[in-house]
């Protein structure tokens, strides 16, 4: 098998993985999204909350897999993709799986993720968001013969600056000195109840 060292090949592999995971875990019912590869220093991936792409007369979601973390083991990349697919499933079926503007993953997300091949752990701030592949998913990945994607975009210090010094992007080896906490703003914003 050829090494995945081109972005076009990486995107193609992720699209193929989406189709196989969709068939296996969702009976092929999820609409195929646009798969993008962009740096997201604070996350392994994300999905848009609405269908933001128009392609071939169809509106589509976007699932982004962070280009900075593509070179993780394939089971971790597949787990991230499946995590985002669970969000898509929840949006498509009307299940409210997050709160706090999509940041906090609630128990409904946990239930859906566990029903679709993921193991879920709790994070104090973000809820049931820490996902890893279940044994069944690992077996599925091995059966599919998926190979690691052998490329990843390195994060520069400027990429990290916007996320707060001291934060560490998943998969990166960069760290920084902690920033002092921001002082609370005394500015109040008034919104007219009739507008």
Language-model regions, residue ranges each:
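Metalloprotease/metallohydrolase-associated module, dominated by Zn2+-dependent proteases
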Residues: 2-63, 67-71, 92-195
């Amino acid at each position: 098998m050829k090494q995945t060292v081109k972005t076009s090949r990486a995107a193609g592999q992720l699209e193929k993985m989406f189709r196989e995971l969709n068939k296996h875990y969702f009976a092929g019912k999820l609409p195929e999204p646009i798969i993008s590869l962009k740096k997201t220093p604070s996350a392994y991936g994300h999905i848009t909350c609405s269908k933001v792409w128009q392609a071939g007369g169809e509106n589509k979601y976007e699932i982004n897999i962070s280009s900075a973390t593509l070179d993780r083991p394939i089971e971790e990349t597949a787990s991230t993709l499946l995590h985002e697919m669970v969000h898509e499933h929840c949006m498509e079926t009307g299940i409210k799986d997050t709160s706090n503007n999509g940041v906090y993953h609630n128990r409904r997300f946990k239930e859906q993720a566990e029903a679709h091949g993921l193991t879920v752990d709790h994070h104090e701030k973000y809820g049931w968001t820490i996902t890893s592949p279940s044994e069944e998913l690992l077996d599925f990945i091995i059966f599919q013969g998926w190979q690691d994607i052998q490329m990843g975009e390195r994060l520069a210090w400027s990429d990290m600056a916007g996320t707060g010094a001291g934060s560490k992007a998943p998969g990166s080896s960069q760290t920084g000195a902690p920033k002092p906490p921001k002082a609370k703003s005394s500015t109040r914003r008034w919104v007219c109840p009739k507008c």
